[in-house]
Regions:
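Active-site-proximal loop and beta-strand segments within enzyme catalytic domains
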Residues: 1-52
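Well-ordered alpha-helical segments within folded domains of soluble proteins
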Residues: 55-60
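Active-site helix/loop module of the DD-peptidase/beta-lactamase fold
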Residues: 1-13, 38-40, 61, 65-93
Length: 93
């Protein structure tokens, strides 16, 4: 991905410490965004590439805004139900 956003998981020692202290914690979207809010971009957007969970979080927020539904509802309505996936669960974190 070429956004330049840092990953809130990879290379984030504070996140790692909290994750290992409570591996079953359910993180809120805001808590995940807070993990990167004070960190600078890794590079100018479009000039390089890196994997970042952050990009998927932001994509989910954009989809929720555009659809007017939360992500679990949107996934159920647009993906899981049409495919007949009845034993698939959503993980927010």
């Amino acid at each position: 991905m070429t956004s330049g956003y840092p990953d809130y998981v990879l290379g984030n020692e504070a996140f790692d410490a909290e994750l290992y202290a409570n591996p079953f914690r359910q993180w809120t979207t805001q808590e995940l965004l807070d993990q990167i809010s004070s960190r600078p971009l890794l590079y100018d957007p479009g000039t390089n590439w890196n994997y970042a969970h952050t990009n998927y979080l932001l994509l989910g927020l954009a989809l929720e805004k555009a659809a007017g539904q939360d992500m679990p509802t949107l996934l159920q309505r647009k993906v899981l139900s049409p495919l007949g996936l009845t034993a698939t669960a959503n993980s927010d974190t």
